[in-house]
């Protein structure tokens, strides 16, 4: 930033979640520096906030090794071109938003040219492939982390990191409107309600749906009025779940929802879900939960050797203890899942204690992340 040139921020987002983060960051920066310029790889939300897109975000949004290999030449060309063009532009700061496989190498290339770099959203280095922290440290001037235990991990290796809180915690209220969510879904206020969330990936839905449905059948024996809501992320997952249900539990009445996962969590007395971001969202919805997860035996064997954490779900990692029950692999079976869910559906001491802890954890990570990220960018730009 000079008197002649406005503050110039380069950004690269590789998927929809990164586009949302990038748009929030740009918005917060524009409030402080109205004439700032933003350039890079952007999705529609970032572009709507005024980011000049040298490449569309969809160019980077590839998943799976086969798709990546098919697009590898194009991805390498884009990264080389960005290295050259950002090197000529000399932005005040480069912000790589998630997409670590693409961005961390790019950040390293730019840092060698004297450009200050930020990696926004820590990869799960604290959980597995921990040696990546050294590459991240060489490539970046600062990591922006959503969760406090991530910062503690980077501090251990002397890699500059700033905990900014989680944007999802900013977006969700501390005290959700349970009856309002039930009204939206058509669930009576006085009914017992269970949410089943068997994952967003095809492999997860395939591995978990049958056990989740059998668990719901067992719970109906205790709670004949039990309302069961099943939000599914897209039409393909819904079709897959309906096929499995027809085989396993054709007579079990459930409410199938297109999306609406957050509403289902807020409306429910308890949730049975796969691990991942859904567990964090469920915690922020203040819905008591049980985490059930299965994977192929060799994958699980490998994961047990690679993963360095005691827990798989974010609520437990945040709490530093088994706050929510995790039933993995052979433990993820209907009798055990139902036994863990029964006390939660009773809405007694167990549920209330979990709810109170969820609220405390929500407050810990509700820090106005967009503003914190903008402040970090401006401090580095000076």
Curated annotation (Swiss-Prot):
GO terms for molecular function: lipid-A-disaccharide synthase activity; phospholipid binding. GO terms for biological process: lipid A biosynthetic process. InterPro entries: Glyco_trans_19. It catalyses: 2-N,3-O-bis[(3R)-3-hydroxytetradecanoyl]-alpha-D-glucosaminyl 1-phosphate + UDP-2-N,3-O-bis[(3R)-3-hydroxytetradecanoyl]-alpha-D-glucosamine = lipid A disaccharide (E. coli) + UDP + H(+); a lipid X + a UDP-2-N,3-O-bis[(3R)-3-hydroxyacyl]-alpha-D-glucosamine = a lipid A disaccharide + UDP + H(+). Keywords: Glycosyltransferase, Lipid A biosynthesis, Lipid biosynthesis, Lipid metabolism, Transferase. One of its GO terms (cellular component) is membrane. Pathway: Glycolipid biosynthesis; lipid IV(A) biosynthesis; lipid IV(A) from (3R)-3-hydroxytetradecanoyl-[acyl-carrier-protein] and UDP-N-acetyl-alpha-D-glucosamine: step 5/6. Its EC number is 2.4.1.182. CDD domains: Glycosyltransferase_GTB-type (cd01635). Condensation of UDP-2,3-diacylglucosamine and 2,3-diacylglucosamine-1-phosphate to form lipid A disaccharide, a precursor of lipid A, a phosphorylated glycolipid that anchors the lipopolysaccharide to the outer membrane of the cell. HAMAP family: LpxB. Belongs to the LpxB family. This is Lipid-A-disaccharide synthase. It comes from Escherichia coli O127:H6 (strain E2348/69 / EPEC). The gene is lpxB.
């Amino acid at each position: 930033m000079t008197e002649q040139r406005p503050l110039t921020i380069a950004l690269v987002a590789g998927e929809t979640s990164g586009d949302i983060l990038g748009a929030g960051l740009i918005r917060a920066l524009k409030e402080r520096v109205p004439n700032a310029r933003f350039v890079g790889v952007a999705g529609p939300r970032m572009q709507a906030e005024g980011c000049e897109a040298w490449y569309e975000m969809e160019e980077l949004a590839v998943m799976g090794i086969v798709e990546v290999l098919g697009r590898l030449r194009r991805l390498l060309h884009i990264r080389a071109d960005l290295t050259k063009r950002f090197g000529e532009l000399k932005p005040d700061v480069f912000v790589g938003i998630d997409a670590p496989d693409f961005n961390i190498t790019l950040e390293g290339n730019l840092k060698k040219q004297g450009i200050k770099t930020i990696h926004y959203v820590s990869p799960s280095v604290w959980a597995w492939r921990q040696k990546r922290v050294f590459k991240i440290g060489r490539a970046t001037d600062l990591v922006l982390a959503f969760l406090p235990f991530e910062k503690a991990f980077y501090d251990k290796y002397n890699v500059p990191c700033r905990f900014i809180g989680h944007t999802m915690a900013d977006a969700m209220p501390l005290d959700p409107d349970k009856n309002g969510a039930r009204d939206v879904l058509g669930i009576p206020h006085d009914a017992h309600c269970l949410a089943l969330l068997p994952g967003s990936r095809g492999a997860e839905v395939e591995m978990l749906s049958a056990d989740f449905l059998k668990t719901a059948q067992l719970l109906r024996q205790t709670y004949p009025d039990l309302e069961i809501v099943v939000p599914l992320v897209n039409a393909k997952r819904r079709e897959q779940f309906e096929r499995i249900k027809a085989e396993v539990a054709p007579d079990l009445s459930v409410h199938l929802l297109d999306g609406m996962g957050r509403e289902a969590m807020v409306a429910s007395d308890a949730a049975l879900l796969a691990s991942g971001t859904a567990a964090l969202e469920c915690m922020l919805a203040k819905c008591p939960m049980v985490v059930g997860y299965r994977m192929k035996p060799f994958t699980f064997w490998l994961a047990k050797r690679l993963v360095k954490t005691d827990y798989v779900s974010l609520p437990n990692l945040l709490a530093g203890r088994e706050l929510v029950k995790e039933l993995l692999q052979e433990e993820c079976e209907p009798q055990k899942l139902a036994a863990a869910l029964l006390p939660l559906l009773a809405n007694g001491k167990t549920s209330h204690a979990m709810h109170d802890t969820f609220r405390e954890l929500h407050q810990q990570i509700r820090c106005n992340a967009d503003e914190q990220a903008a402040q970090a960018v401006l401090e580095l730009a000076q």
